[in-house]
Amino acid sequence: MLLDGRKTADILNEALRVKVQYLTKKPKLEIILIGNDEASKSYVKGKLNTASNLGMEVHINYLDEAIDQLSVEALIQKLNTDKGVHGILLQLPIPKHLDSDYLISLIDYKKDVDGFHTMNQGLLFQKKDGIRPATPLGIMMLLDFYNIPIEGKHVVIIGRSQIVGAPLSKMFLDRNATVTITHSKTKNLPSITKQADILVAAIGKPKFVTKDMVKVGAVVVDVGINRVDKKLVGDVDFEHVEPIASYITPVPKGVGPMTICALAHNLYALYLKQEKE
């Protein structure tokens, strides 16, 4: 059965839209887009469309690819102090001459809609209230929408990034799952993935997960977005894995829409916190 991220996001977003219309002012998101990366432009367009449809305000700061570090830092500091701005998002990747880690650390963690700031990462790992990274949050929202049990399940995550793998592992742990994280140095990977009740692929390698790596009846979550022969494909060989999986996310229309959905919910949460202060 498909885990339909597009359909789920539409339903959850509609519920959020109703909440937003009763707010005294619109939650506002500032997006910083540096350079002309076509994939980044596409992602930003999706975020803009979703937020606008929800009654939220979005402003995109288009910056030249050759912009210097200090200029980006100055923009972030300006947005940090603007009380009319509730969320700030630095669209990744950015040009290599810029320090993305430092720029993310400059964003006020109370406006960190992506959940990448070290403060929000720390709050997650201390099991305290904070903004969760959007892709892991979107995955959890999707599994919950389909009432997929998590407690007591063996979750195997392929990929250990700070954006997906590491925070997602903690979110599963907090739901009482048994979690195994695998990566490029893991030996005998198929023998591990085949034990998974829930298998998450987040490595950026097209069709990496094959049928022989998946247990019959497993739930398969494909985070990958890879362009092959002008088509988008995931990290999972969908055609051959889908028949043996109990649930599986497609690419596209799987995790992607849920990431944007989670971003919108994060912006709403940031708005509520800031308006209380």
Curated annotation (Swiss-Prot):
Keyword Lipoprotein on entry? no
Quote the pathway field.
Answer: One-carbon metabolism; tetrahydrofolate interconversion
Put simply, this protein is called Bifunctional protein FolD
As one GO molecular function, the record gives: methenyltetrahydrofolate cyclohydrolase activity
Q: Which residues bind NADP(+)?
A: 159-161, 184, 225
Could you tell me the keywords of this UniProt record?
Amino-acid biosynthesis, Histidine biosynthesis, Hydrolase, Methionine biosynthesis, Multifunctional enzyme, NADP, One-carbon metabolism, Oxidoreductase, Purine biosynthesis
**Which PANTHER family does this one have?**
C-1-TETRAHYDROFOLATE SYNTHASE, CYTOPLASMIC, C-1-TETRAHYDROFOLATE SYNTHASE, CYTOPLASMIC-RELATED
Starting at the broadest rank, the lineage of the source organism is:
Bacteria, Bacillati, Mycoplasmatota, Mollicutes, Acholeplasmatales
Query: Mind telling me which InterPro entries this protein's record contains?
Result: Aminoacid_DH-like_N_sf, NAD(P)-bd_dom_sf, THF_DH/CycHdrlase, THF_DH/CycHdrlase_cat_dom, THF_DH/CycHdrlase_CS, THF_DH/CycHdrlase_NAD-bd_dom
Q: What does this protein do?
A: Catalyzes the oxidation of 5,10-methylenetetrahydrofolate to 5,10-methenyltetrahydrofolate and then the hydrolysis of 5,10-methenyltetrahydrofolate to 10-formyltetrahydrofolate.
N-terminal signal peptide? none
**Might you report a single GO cellular component term?**
cytosol
Q: Which family does it belong to?
A: Belongs to the tetrahydrofolate dehydrogenase/cyclohydrolase family.
What EC number(s) is this enzyme filed under?
A: 1.5.1.5, 3.5.4.9
Which transformation does this protein catalyse, written as a reaction?
(6R)-5,10-methylene-5,6,7,8-tetrahydrofolate + NADP(+) = (6R)-5,10-methenyltetrahydrofolate + NADPH; (6R)-5,10-methenyltetrahydrofolate + H2O = (6R)-10-formyltetrahydrofolate + H(+)
What the entry lists under CDD domains is as follows: NAD_bind_m-THF_DH_Cyclohyd
| UniProt keyword Cell inner membrane, yes or no | no
Quaternary structure and partners:
Homodimer.
One GO term under biological process is: tetrahydrofolate interconversion
